[in-house]
Amino acid sequence: MFTQVKSTIRHIAPDDLRGRKLIKVVYVVLESQYQSALSQAVREINANHPSVAIEISGYLIEELRNSENYEELKRDIASANIFIASLIFIEDLAQKLVAAVEPHRDNFDVAVVFPSMPEVMRLNKMGSFSLAQLGQSKSVIANFMKKRKEKSGAGFQDGMLKLLRTLPQVLKFLPIEKAQDARNFMLSFQYWLGGSAENLENFLLMLADKYVLKGEDKQKLAAADYQAPVVYPDMGIWHPLAPNMFEDVREYLNWYAVRRDISRNLKDPLAPCVGLVLQRTHLVTGDDAHYVAIVQELESLGAKVLPVFAGGLDFSKPVDMQLLGGKISAVRNAHLT
């Protein structure tokens, strides 16, 4: 359904460089959740950053079945400073992407590929650290990659999250220079999983600082110009009117019970309760309008709503931990795209 969409609709370039360094970014992703947040991040940089401007082009992987989009990708790749890809698990399209990107990989300043098929992951390039080298290494990361490379996207992403949490122990097995680049890769993954426009803005500025800018351009961009990732729960409970995400069902139900915008009937412990299963990326990137509409409609019909989310594709954990303790009358998978 994406093949008739022209990828040029996602192209953003600064109106005026004002003497700033122009950095060209190309990204290829599975679904459209990141489009809005990335676009907002780039527009914020172009409007307000004193030393850096971004030109960005984006593609959904299915769009590469269209020959016009594929040729456009190859043209964009040829002049890119930064390449980003995520969740590329469709085999024929993964091979097509590698064929377009691999000839230009050495010319990138940096390439960051998040959970994808092994041949796509090998396109990663961050300083002296390259995932393509891990097959010849005896490091902890190498063993992790070998065990995970045949697994599904959900298992791979869950494994990457575990690796992220044990990063200090992993880095001690690498030489200092490679350890720093490995840290930057995992830091990039934190920014990406955070998904908000703020996180993605800081992600792009971090890559610019560490890998793109040289000499005077680098001196203009101090590390203070970007912030550490804002980390959101891997799984939990969300509501469009709540002040934050919840990691405990009791905290969520306590908040629900003191809401002033709903009737007493909804606060009744015996009120019907509908559990929703949501995908985390839609929430952190702000691509949540369909979730908001579902919650509002169910509440208007007299049902209490308990929307749980998870970061991977395995929703059994949040269902077991949150929904089964919430006196649920019905469960609905709300992953509608």
Could you describe each region identified by the protein language model?
Residues 1-337:
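An N-terminal assembly and electron-transfer interface module characteristic of large anaerobic redox
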